């Protein structure tokens, strides 16, 4: 998908761009829901899942003692250090995708913010409140 600047003021003409950004926001919300479950409610993680990776009370040992493992290399070492950065990166990417490109009226930015909030919230509650419910 190529995003090009345009003078077209039709909000509906940008629906693909808004949908792509909303999708990234939903993924961000889902990642945040998983992250918060892992950090604050590890007892909600299914027993059949690998505790060494999912349970933050023991997964911190996965990082090792090297400087690399304690810094940027910790990404992917456990669920907390995978879904936390994924949440932040997809949140940023969604905001960029939604706002880049054409000039718009002021209320269209507000509508995009609302779509973003609803999408993020839906992703979050799908994981935190529904999938990992007690």
Enumerate the language-model features and the residues they cover.
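Cleavable N-terminal export/targeting peptides
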Residues: 1-8
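Catalytic phosphate/metal-binding cores of nucleic-acid and nucleotide-processing enzymes, i.e., regions
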Residues: 9-134
């Amino acid at each position: 998908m190529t995003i090009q600047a345009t003078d077209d003021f039709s909000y509906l003409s940008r629906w693909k761009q808004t949908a792509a950004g909303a999708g990234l926001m939903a993924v961000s919300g889902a990642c945040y829901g998983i992250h918060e479950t892992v950090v604050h409610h590890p007892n909600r993680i299914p027993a059949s899942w690998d505790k060494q990776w999912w349970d933050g009370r023991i997964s911190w040992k996965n990082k090792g003692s090297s400087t690399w493992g304690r810094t940027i290399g910790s990404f992917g070492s456990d669920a907390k250090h995978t879904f936390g950065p994924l949440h932040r990166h997809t949140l940023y990417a969604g905001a960029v995708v939604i706002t880049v490109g054409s000039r718009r009226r002021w209320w269209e930015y507000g509508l995009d913010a609302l779509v973003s909030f609803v999408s993020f919230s839906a992703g979050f509650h799908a994981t935190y409140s529904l999938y990992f419910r007690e």
